[in-house]
């Protein structure tokens, strides 16, 4: 009993929780394959840059119809490395979406830049490209659209904006690996 709160106000309807994601069920479908891969890595002792990583990178590049793929520890690391490769750093601004995993803004912050959040399109939940130019300042160095739910952001207008203003585009595709723009 909660002191001072009448019991009528403490009633909670019986609600069955909705699981965020069932990793146990997902894991069960590929458990044998994972165990075999882990055993191969332990047997080879090649924990970094070994044959398994090289094979994964080739497979991922082929899956994404890309010339190259580079395996890193996480999507966050991929974004940080991409920002650094684009020479984004302290004092710079990167326009991105607020509707994303916290790592998107966190990666921008990690390199010393400031995330500038632009609203999303209500039908796709992706970056509203019409708001990008109005959010730009002289410190804007890049635009980081986030491809969500396997659906790519509207890239054509972003490419035009980037070319016209000398900006880098760094695509956060962590939630849309294999997604195709107008494909």
Where are these regions (language model features)?
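Short beta-strand segments
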Residues: 20-22, 73, 144-146
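Active-site His/Glu-centered metal-binding helix of metallohydrolases
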Residues: 60, 173-174
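Phosphate-binding glycine-rich loop
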Residues: 42-93, 106-111, 116-119
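N-terminal "arm"/small-domain region of PLP-dependent enzymes with the aminotransferase-like
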Residues: 1-46, 51
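Solvent-exposed, non-membrane alpha-helical residues enriched in polar/charged side chains
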Residues: 35, 39, 57-61, 80, ...
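PLP-dependent aminotransferase-like
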Residues: 84-173, 180
């Amino acid at each position: 009993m909660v002191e001072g709160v009448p019991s009528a106000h403490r009633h909670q309807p019986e609600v069955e929780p909705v699981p965020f994601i069932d990793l146990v069920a997902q894991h069960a479908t590929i458990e044998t394959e994972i165990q075999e891969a882990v055993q191969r890595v332990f047997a080879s002792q090649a924990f970094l840059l070994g044959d398994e990583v090289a094979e994964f990178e080739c497979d991922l590049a082929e899956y994404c119809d890309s010339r190259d793929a580079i395996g890193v520890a996480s999507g966050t690391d991929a974004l940080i490395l991409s920002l650094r490769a684009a020479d984004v750093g302290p004092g710079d601004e990167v326009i991105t979406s607020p509707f994303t995993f916290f790592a998107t803004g966190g990666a921008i912050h990690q390199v010393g830049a400031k995330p500038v959040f632009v609203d999303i399109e209500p039908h796709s939940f992706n970056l509203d490209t019409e708001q990008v130019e109005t959010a730009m300042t002289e410190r804007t160095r890049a635009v980081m659209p986030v491809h969500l739910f396997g659906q790519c952001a509207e890239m054509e207008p972003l490419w035009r904006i980037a070319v016209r203003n000398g900006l880098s585009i760094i695509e956060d595709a962590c939630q849309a690996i294999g997604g195709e723009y107008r494909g």
